[in-house]
Amino acid sequence: MRLAPQKPLLLSTVLHLLLSIWMLGFASLAGATVQEPLAASDTPKPVSAALFSSIERLSRLVDITYCVGNTGVWKPFACASRCNEFPTLTLERTWRTGILMSDSCGLIAVDHGTPRHDAGEGKDDPLAEKAIIVAFRGTYSLTNTIIDLSTIPQEYVPYPSPDDGGNEPPREPSHRCDNCTVHSGFLASWRHARKVVLPELKVLRQKYPEYPIRLVGHSLGGAVAMLAALEMRVSLGWRDTVVTTFGEPRVGNRQLCDYLNAVFELNLGDEMDPAEREYRRVTHADDPVPLLPPAEWGYSSHGGEFFISKKDLPPSVEDVLVCHGDHDENCIARGKSSAVSVPAGDYDDALSTLEEQDVMLADALPWIPARLKLWELFFAHRDYFWRLGLCVPGGDPANWGRKGGEGAAESISAEG
């Protein structure tokens, strides 16, 4: 069954995005203790040309995941979008656990580093390298997920919960996650995906033991990739897991972010070559999602950020900056460096700071100023080297409302 989303649905998503942005303005009103995150050490510098190319390639790869549940991705590695740009990949499987916001969608592929026999002469990918790739798709309504879906944080443990057949970690973890909380909706999405992803990866790791694991995700998929990476590294001991996310929302509290920084050694600062980072969190100018859910709900950002400073497409090497710390004020944080630390169980106290603002929000909506340019904010979350989210050849022939192009919001379709 194919469903064509209607214009009001997309408008509703934009309005939810506005509400989320509006909530960011109340971070300073929270009554919880403010804990300083890792600070920026100096002015960000551009990435190297090689790192730029590597991240750009992954943005095209994660764009392909939007074909899953739409027109499809099929073996050996074909789709209606950019699959022909990856002649060295073979598809292992796709998954789609359902249509609810807590469900997950994506693909697992193997990059053999050399073109497939069916790729044809002249087909090559100079950036290809041997790897097992797991790509997590985003959602067309991430803001709905953030606001409406189980936003109450829950306790986080870095190994499978009893619900997932776990009880104790398989070994004494080298890092502890004390008093960590996680967005329960994002965790539910990973729990749905892990039933498919982990068994497949265990088989592939036996088949290709020398291939590292590369996780990539956009939007909600970035949040799921983060939780997947922590479990793979800590619980399963897969140290060769490297992560790249685009427009990743905040997933947990300050303690969880500190934990991730330690696991992926993001707290080394300038001691680490940016190209050697094993967690790359890519953000884009004016994209509000990396700052959501807001800090007054007990959420924070972690390190590893690379910031696309140019608003319009396409960016150049000089536009992609290496950020420092968790909240580099030269990057997506833009001065919003305070992170509210809300211990497990104290969510209601933090949320109570918002209750008095409900009437103010209702009164403010009729006077939304046109200068906010809501469509530009919506597109900013899609614009990561390319405009992501359309399963069409070349990614975005209609430009989706960019300067000089016609909007094509009505053309999205998805399978139910």
Curated annotation (Swiss-Prot):
As for pH, the annotation reads: Optimum pH is 8.0.
Signal sequence segment: 1-32
**Which Pfam families does the annotation name?**
Lipase_3
Write out the entry's keywords from A to Z.
Carbohydrate metabolism, Disulfide bond, Glycoprotein, Hydrolase, Lipid degradation, Lipid metabolism, Polysaccharide degradation, Secreted, Serine esterase, Signal, Xylan degradation
Q: Which domain of life is it from?
A: Eukaryota
List cystine links: C67-C391, C177-C180
Q: What InterPro entries does the entry give?
A: AB_hydrolase_fold, AB_hydrolase_lip/est, Fungal_lipase-type
Q: Could you state one GO cellular component term attached to this entry?
A: extracellular region
Q: Where is the active site?
A: S219 (nucleophile), D287 (charge relay system), H381 (charge relay system)
Q: How does activity depend on temperature?
A: Optimum temperature is 40 degrees Celsius. Thermostable from 20 to 50 degrees Celsius.
> What's the PTM story here?
Glycosylated.
- Can you say where in the cell this protein is located? Secreted
Main localization, broad class: secreted
Write down the PANTHER family for this protein, in alphabetical order.
FUNGAL LIPASE-LIKE DOMAIN-CONTAINING PROTEIN-RELATED, TRIACYLGLYCEROL LIPASE, PUTATIVE (AFU_ORTHOLOGUE AFUA_6G06510)-RELATED
The name under which this protein is listed is Lipase A
- Which source organism does the UniProt entry give? Sodiomyces alcalophilus
Give the gene name: lipA
